[in-house]
């Protein structure tokens, strides 16, 4: 299941988790495109449930999106909280190198929301 929701204020929430469906990878990549095209400033909460994986082609598309949208993300995203179950590995380090805005990897959605709420407004 993939969902991109605009919540109150400037918060965008991207959800990618079970139950997984055949079109999830395309929906996830489409959600990234929608985030990259957003004109208004925002904070992003990315909630990943389970251990769904992208195909090699999906990984490549995601990496190209990171490169293509870097300047726009720097200009409009004020912070990113990534919620991952279990051991996040090096996620915070990897994503923190992509952008200069604040990035955290949280164990729960509540922790991610608290991090975003503590960031200064745009």
Where are the predicted features?
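Amphipathic, Lys/Arg-enriched alpha-helical "gate/interface" segment within cytosolic domains
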Residues: 1-122
């Amino acid at each position: 299941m993939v969902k991109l929701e605009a919540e109150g204020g400037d918060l965008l929430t991207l959800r990618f988790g079970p139950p997984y469906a055949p079109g999830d990878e395309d929906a996830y990549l489409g959600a990234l495109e929608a985030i990259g095209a957003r004109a208004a400033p925002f904070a992003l909460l990315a909630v990943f449930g389970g251990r769904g994986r992208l195909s090699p082609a999906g990984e490549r598309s995601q990496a190209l999106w990171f490169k293509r949208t870097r300047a726009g993300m720097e200009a409009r995203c004020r912070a990113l909280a990534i919620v991952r179950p279990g051991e996040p590995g090096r996620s915070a380090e990897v994503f923190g190198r992509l952008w200069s805005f604040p990035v955290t990897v949280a164990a729960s959605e509540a922790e991610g929301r608290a991090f975003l709420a503590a960031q200064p407004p745009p």
